[in-house]
Amino acid sequence: MLAVFAISGCYSLEPRSAGSVMRLVEESEKITATGYAVIAIQNSDDAAQRRLLAIRASKLDAYRALAEQVFGQRIDSQTTIGELVVNNDAFRSRVEGVIYGAELESIEPLNGDTYAVTLSLRKQVVKDLRLLYLRSLLRDAA
C-alpha cells in the first residue's frame, strides 16, 4: 500500500502550463516540417514541369505545416441535429501566419511519383515569429 502511494505521489494530474509547453520547443535547436505533393496530378503536359510543380506544391505544404507548429490551427465546426439524429457534421481548419527564415533541409522523390520537401526554422526565429504574432493581436485588439 505504501509503495503504491509513493509511486502515485510522483505523478501530477495538473495540466501543463503554457511555460512548460514553450520549453518543449526551446529544448530543440529547430523545428522541422515536411510537405508532400504527387507529380501525376500536377497541371501540365510536360513531365519535367509536373516534377517542378510537385516540388513547389510540396514546399508550400511544408510552409503550411511550419505555420501550424508556430501559430497553431483555428478549427471551426458545426453540427446539425434533427429529431436526435446528426444530419450534418462539418468542420474547417485554418492556418494563418507569416513564416520567414525557413531553411531548406531536403527535396526527396518518394516512390517515383511524389516529392517530399523538408523545411526547418531555428528556435530564435520561432520566438521572433510568435512575438510578432502576439504583438499584432494586441495591436488589433486595441
For the regions a protein language model found, what residue spans apply to each?
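Domain-level marker for long, solvent-exposed, non-transmembrane regions
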Residues: 10-142
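Sec-dependent bacterial lipoprotein signal peptides
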Residues: 1-10
